[in-house]
Amino acid sequence: AAHAGGAFGFGAQRGGKGGNMSIFSDGHAAMQAFNPQAGWVFAAIFGVLLLASAIAAALKWRLHGQANATIDNLNARINAWWVMTAVLLLAFWLGRIGTIVLFFLVSFAALREFLSLVESRRADHRVMVVCFYVLLPLQYWFVLTDWYGMFSIFIPVYGFLLLPIIASLGGDTDHFLARTAKIQWAVMISIFCLSHVPALMNLKIAGFEGQNILLLVFLVAVVQASDVLQYVWGKLLGKRKIMPALSPSKTVAGTVGGIASATLLAAALYPITPFSPFQAALIGLIICIMGFLGGLVMSAIKRDRGVKDWGNLIHGHGGMLDRVDSVCFAAPVFFHVVRYFWNG
């Protein structure tokens, strides 16, 4: 891997070349081959899942068929992780286009969940149609064609202006600002933030050509591991709640232990990245903190709407947004840190 140097261990490469609107730009953009190193990471994940499944099965066996909500929920969570990991592996194996399609579908599901919880009126229906059938496909088209200029400003600028314009044409001014702002939030979180995950495939990093899929593996593995480890440490040692009004299940010990453990995991994964061990740990710490804060923000929104979960799409986990809320906040930061310091 090509390691960057400079202040705080980061390189001086910044900016990057704009996209040329070609799906096959620079030869790497069409379908990057699945990297063997990513395969080893997934093998380790499947190994952990196999161990977790064995432990859960043993716990259930000890109950001799008696119902236990905690054990049943644990089994449901583990089974869901098997499915999610397999789907992610398949998308990564298919390469760049498969990964973009997967996250397009994730954004679609997340947007649907978000908009289903906001108050809407008849005048908002056209706005929502634009969100699903204009903003969503165009944003991922810009990822597919590697058009960074439009990818970075389309939703924050043009989408931000377009949505209230369409809403105002409906002639309904009742709670206009609140209705429009909620839809803008839904688009930013569900489409713009999530689209930064597959956009990592478009970065051009010296000495790392054709291996960008490993950046996605690093991001998803570290952020999701942080979530799981915060839960585990919280169950083992957690007593003091960190933000009981927002997330009653989060504890100080769980948060600190989970983020610290995931940061160590990030350092251990440095061989699959263009980072040094220190850089990988520092970036891991940043994205874990962003993931934690993102989880708090999304929990605050759920509390405001009076619901426990965003949906029930993923058995044992809730909705799509319940599973990717931390990634939504970590992905843009990770993307721009890598692009600023490593992109050629």
Regions found by a protein language model. Name each.
Residues H3-P36, G344:
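Short, strongly hydrophobic alpha-helical membrane anchors
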Residues V337-G344:
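Juxtamembrane boundary at the C-terminal end of a transmembrane helix
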Residues S22-I286:
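Membrane-embedded alpha-helical bundles of polytopic integral membrane proteins
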Residues C328, P332-V337:
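Hydrophobic alpha-helical transmembrane segments of membrane transport and translocation systems
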Residues R305-S326:
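Interfacial loop-to-transmembrane junctions
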